[in-house]
Structure formats: C-alpha cells, structure tokens
C-alpha cells in the first residue's frame, strides 16, 4: 500500500471553501473512493487556506493513473482558479512502527 499526500494551497478561505464543496459534491471524492486502487481517503484543512488529502492507494501507479484521469476531465482548470501554488503530491510507505 502507498500513502499519497496531496496539498492544495488555496488563494483564500473563499477558494478553500469552494474546493471543499467540490470535494464533497457528486464529482469529488465520491468518485475517488470507487476509483481502481483507492483504499481510502481523508480530507484535512489547515491554516492559510490549505486543504490536504491523506490517501491510501494500492500503488503509486494506481494513484498516478487516477490523477491523470482527473486532469483529463477538467480538474486542472478548476485548480487554476482555486490554488495560489501548484498542487503538491508526495508518496510515502507505512513503516508499521
């Protein structure tokens, strides 16, 4: 299993709210949770209009296929309106500690 951390640095609290609304809507995380390889996802919010996704995936390749599918279907355009900086994605392995 792979952990993917996606960090969205929104332009303001308004854009953060719009992103969270989209994530909670019919085109958001409901589709992520049934995408091939997704084993779970949690949404976090932080200071300075940040949203982070803690995602559990079967593999890095599964997550990258998912991100590619999202970008092909218009998410990149939406992110440009909401984000002050490019989307950040990092991958981690669980240590069992």
Regions found by a protein language model. Give the residues of each.
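Short S/T/G/P-rich N-terminal loop/turn motif that feeds into the first structured element of a domain
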Residues: 1-51, 58-70, 84-97
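Anionic, Ser/Thr-rich low-complexity intrinsically disordered regions
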Residues: 73-79
